[in-house]
């Protein structure tokens, strides 16, 4: 029996911070694999989201704020190996940050689909068409589509636009895969999300969450030890809070979300440590 052709390719999701890249990839994959927040630059690493629909495998990459990074970093390597770029813009707003991102991605001459996100927040819909015309001239995309990632408006339509551009390639990942990230990574992302939620503007800009151990002990319960690394003692005090109320809230909220994600009871210990300079 003749083997049917398979189609597979990487699709880079780019845009300035806070345009909804992480929300979009979560809605496409229909699973929260990338953290979302109103705080800028919440995505610190390239997040891979995989969606396999029969013969077609779409590998979406949620890139962190690429316009600030070195062109030799992983984000740009991913973009160069992509077959398509989803360039996300925020409603009818065009700023210097958008211009910087556009100039970076145009160098690679990879086809661009322009995605106008958050259209649910536009009250006067008559301003959308003039902005589409502006973007057509500015970006010269192969397609342009208004969506609301948060409301799932036009998400399926966007996916349908991508189909024709997938090249004839064998699938890279097994059918059931939705991301390449480990359990440790997923847990660390949940903890980081809670840090952002509870601390907001007080959150240190450079912060690392490391999962030190995951052990399954009696009664089928996971014991997880995590460490939050900060640069200064002052930052440590901010996270812990008065009478340890801050870290308590973060720990409880993290535990509940982790249990929901893995469908298993856990015991979570979170330490806050000052990173020793080498």
Swiss-Prot record:
Q: What is its main location?
A: cytoplasm
Q: Where is this region: G2?
A: 41-45
Q: Which residues form the KH type-2 domain?
A: 199-276
UniProt keyword Signal present: no
Q: Where is this region: G3?
A: 62-65
UniProt entry keywords in alphabetical sequence:
Cell membrane, Cytoplasm, GTP-binding, Membrane, Nucleotide-binding, Ribosome biogenesis, RNA-binding, rRNA-binding
| Entry superkingdom | Bacteria
Extract the ranges annotated as region (G5). 147-149
The record's section on Pfam families has: KH_2 (PF07650), MMR_HSR1 (PF01926)
InterPro entries assigned = G_ERA_dom, GTP-bd, GTPase_Era-like, KH_dom-like_a/b, KH_dom_type_2, KH_sf_prok-type, P-loop_NTPase, Small_GTP-bd
Q: Where is this region: G4?
A: 117-120
NCBIfam families linked: era, PRK00089.1, small_GTP
Task: Please state which protein family the record places this protein in.
Answer: Belongs to the TRAFAC class TrmE-Era-EngA-EngB-Septin-like GTPase superfamily. Era GTPase family.
The record's subunit annotation is: Monomer.
Please report the name of this protein according to its UniProt entry: GTPase Era
Q: Which organism is it from?
A: Buchnera aphidicola subsp. Schizaphis graminum (strain Sg)
């Amino acid at each position: 029996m003749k083997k049917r052709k398979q189609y597979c390719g990487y699709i880079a999701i780019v845009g300035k911070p806070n345009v909804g890249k992480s929300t979009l990839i979560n809605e496409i994959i229909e699973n929260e694999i990338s953290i979302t927040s109103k705080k800028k630059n919440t995505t610190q690493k390239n997040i891979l989201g995989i969606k396999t629909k029969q013969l077609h495998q779409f590998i979406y990459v949620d890139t962190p704020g690429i316009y600030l990074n070195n062109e030799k970093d992983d984000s740009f390597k991913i973009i160069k190996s992509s077959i398509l770029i989803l360039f996300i813009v925020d409603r009818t707003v065009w700023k210097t940050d958008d211009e910087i991102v556009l100039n970076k991605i145009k160098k690679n001459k990879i086809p661009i689909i322009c995605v106008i996100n958050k259209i649910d927040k536009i009250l006067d819909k008559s301003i959308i068409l003039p902005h589409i015309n502006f973007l057509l001239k500015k970006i010269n995309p192969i397609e342009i589509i208004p969506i609301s990632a948060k409301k799932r408006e036009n998400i399926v339509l966007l996916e349908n636009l991508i189909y024709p551009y997938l090249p004839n390639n064998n699938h890279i990942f097994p059918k059931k895969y939705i991301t390449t990230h480990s359990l440790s990574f997923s847990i660390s992302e949940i903890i980081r999300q809670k840090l952002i939620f509870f601390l907001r503007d007080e959150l240190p800009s450079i912060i690392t969450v490391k999962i030190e151990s995951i052990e399954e002990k009696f009664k089928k319960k996971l014991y997880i030890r995590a460490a939050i690394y900060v640069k200064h003692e002052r930052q440590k005090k901010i996270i812990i809070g008065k009478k340890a109320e801050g870290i308590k809230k973060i720990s409880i909220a993290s535990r509940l979300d982790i249990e929901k994600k893995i469908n298993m009871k856990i015991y979570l210990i979170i330490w806050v440590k000052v990173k020793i300079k080498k």
